[in-house]
Amino acid sequence: MEMKNMVVGLFLIAAFALPALATSFEKDFITHETVQAILKKVGPSSNGMLDEQAISALTGKTIISNPVLEEALLTHSNSINALGGTLPCGESCVWIPCISAVVGCSCKSKVCYKNSLA
């Protein structure tokens, strides 16, 4: 009986803890500088505005500091999927599209990159 209670308890813990853990690893991120650039582009003195979906998507991304992004890029720059020297916009697009598209960025390989023609 005691073993049965332990197994049931383990399954209950796994049922509630594991989904939350999995979603924390798959969240999109955005840097503070990218948020500032977007807000400057669509500010009150400009003609652009973010629609309701873009605002909802922006609040769904995790804001990280620029040094964290730079460290991650430096760590993975020599990997098989190297970035190739292009400039990332400070935003990922794993689940949510690039909100920084208003400042000339587009999604490629789950990372938003600056369009050189913009």
From Swiss-Prot:
The similarity comment for this entry is: Belongs to the cyclotide family. Bracelet subfamily.
Please list the tissues where expression of this protein has been recorded.
Expressed in leaves, petals and petioles but not in roots and runners (at protein level).
Print the keywords alphabetically: Disulfide bond, Knottin, Plant defense, Signal
The name this protein goes by in its record: Cycloviolacin-O11
Q: List the disulfide bonds.
A: C89-C105, C93-C107, C98-C112
Gene Ontology biological process terms in this record = defense response
Q: Where is this cross-link: Cyclopeptide (Gly-Asn)?
A: G85-N115
Propeptide span(s): 23-84, 116-118
Free-text domain note: The presence of a 'disulfide through disulfide knot' structurally defines this protein as a knottin.
Which organism does this sequence originate in? Viola odorata
